[in-house]
């Protein structure tokens, strides 16, 4: 498999969005929702050339008549038939390439079950006939994208958050922590607190509206209690949002109450530690000699770290937990929404990486378990 003349494909399958494109590019060509929609009612649209399923943006735009499903939950693929549909859509409709002509780099969640990486490998070689493939851990790619090989990545997407300490390019599995609290939970929480104000959002279609409100208006307060007092005493923090039907709603303290759940999961009725404490706990599980390097390289990654104010708050909270003399640095690259994909694009275009691919020949010889030997 000579990777010189053929461009590799990089696909980052997130719980909420799929990011896909070509190795060597500086941004993904295609970014679309990781959803598969099926009609709720059969045959209401006569002559529409009805399909039995829709993927991505098309599913999103027809959401009023569809039931939407996410095949990736908490970062891990749970529905392989739908996942195959998403990959098919990625190759043929979004990138318009023949998968049998390009090596494919896929990403996976930290601590992804072994059976899952095998299944991914099997589908790529057997269903799509790719000449070569590789599976890389998402957080490691984010760190590469920030130009580092050592640091701790706090990756928070739509379905799951992880803190992943990485030393000299290797993730330290014993210190990786997973937090099942991410963008989708924050959207649900915002739906709940808006409902308390008398606005009703219930369907899967309305959830997408609330997600948009969250992405456009929410922010992280540096001091939550103080922000609550400010919000109570003045309307300075209020913003208005126009719904698709023209109704205008006003949103006040919900703007920062929503992402506050990242730091106080008890808001969602969860007993776990917040993202700051989880980051600290991850660092404490590492060898004492490398902690200084981790504290000095805390890299934020994923769409749920895009809230304004999150880096300052993280700095404040970690400083309170860490030894008083410790230098703490939070790195929040502006492109962090796509840093996993960007890291994959960098990795797959390195000349030194070309011997790392799992080739079709190796797969035919060893079967799906080859992935554990070659992808670390």
UniProtKB/Swiss-Prot annotation:
**PANTHER family recorded for this chain?**
ACTIN
Q: Where in the cell is it found?
A: Cytoplasm, Cytoskeleton
Further information in the entry reads: This protein is the only actin found in the cytoplasm of the plasmodium of Physarum polycephalum. There are three different genes which code for this actin.
Q: Which SUPFAM superfamilies match?
A: Actin-like ATPase domain (SSF53067)
Family annotation (CDD domains): ASKHA_NBD_actin
Instruction: Quote the PTM field.
Output: Phosphorylated by actin-fragmin kinase (AFK).
Query: List-wise, which residues carry Tele-methylhistidine?
Result: 74
Cellular component annotations (GO), alphabetically ordered: actin cytoskeleton; cytoplasm
Q: An example of a Gene Ontology BP annotation on this entry?
A: phagocytosis
In the record, Blocked amino end (Glu) modifications are located at 2
Which reaction does this enzyme catalyse, per its entry? ATP + H2O = ADP + phosphate + H(+)
Q: Which GO terms describe its molecular function?
A: ATP binding; hydrolase activity
State the function annotated in the UniProt record. Actins are highly conserved proteins that are involved in various types of cell motility and are ubiquitously expressed in all eukaryotic cells.
- EC number(s): the record gives 3.6.4.-
Q: What is this protein called?
A: Actin, plasmodial isoform
Q: Which keywords fit this entry according to its UniProt record?
A: ATP-binding, Cytoplasm, Cytoskeleton, Hydrolase, Methylation, Nucleotide-binding, Phosphoprotein
Please give the family membership noted in the entry. Answer: Belongs to the actin family.
């Amino acid at each position: 498999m000579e990777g010189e003349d053929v461009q590799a494909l990089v696909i980052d399958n997130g719980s909420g969005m799929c990011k896909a494109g070509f190795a060597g590019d500086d941004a993904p060509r295609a970014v679309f929702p990781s959803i598969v929609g099926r009609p709720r009612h059969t045959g209401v649209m006569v002559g529409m050339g009805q399909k039995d399923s829709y993927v991505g943006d098309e599913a999103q735009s027809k959401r009023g008549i569809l039931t939407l499903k996410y095949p990736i939950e908490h970062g891990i693929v749970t529905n392989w038939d739908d996942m195959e549909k998403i990959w098919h859509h990625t190759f043929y409709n979004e990138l318009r390439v023949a998968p049998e002509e390009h090596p494919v780099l896929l990403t996976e969640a930290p601590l992804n079950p072994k059976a899952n990486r095998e299944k991914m490998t099997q589908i790529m070689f057997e269903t799509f006939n790719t000449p070569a493939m590789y599976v890389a851990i998402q957080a490691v790619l984010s760190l590469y994208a920030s130009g580092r090989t050592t640091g701790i990545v706090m990756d928070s997407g739509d379905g799951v958050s992880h803190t992943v300490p990485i030393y000299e390019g290797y993730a330290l599995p014993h210190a990786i922590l997973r937090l099942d609290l991410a963008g989708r939970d924050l959207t649900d929480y915002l739906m709940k607190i808006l409902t308390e104000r008398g606005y009703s959002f219930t369907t899967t279609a309305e959830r997408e509206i609330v997600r948009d409100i969250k992405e456009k208006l929410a922010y992280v307060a540096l001091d939550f209690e103080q922000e609550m007092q400010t919000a109570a005493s003045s309307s300075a923090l209020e913003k208005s949002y126009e719904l698709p039907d023209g109704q205008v709603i006003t949103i006040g303290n919900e703007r920062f109450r929503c992402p506050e759940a990242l730091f106080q999961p008890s808001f969602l009725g969860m007993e776990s530690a917040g993202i700051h404490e989880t980051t600290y706990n991850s660092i404490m599980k590492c060898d004492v000699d490398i902690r200084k390097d981790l504290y000095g390289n805390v890299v934020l990654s994923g769409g749920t770290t895009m809230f304004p104010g999150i880096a300052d708050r993280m700095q404040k909270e970690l400083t309170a937990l860490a030894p008083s003399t410790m230098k703490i640095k939070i790195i929040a690259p502006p492109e962090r929404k796509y840093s996993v994909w960007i890291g994959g694009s960098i990795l797959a275009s390195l000349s030194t990486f070309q011997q790392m691919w799992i080739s079709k020949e190796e797969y035919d010889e060893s079967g799906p378990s080859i992935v554990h030997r070659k992808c670390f």
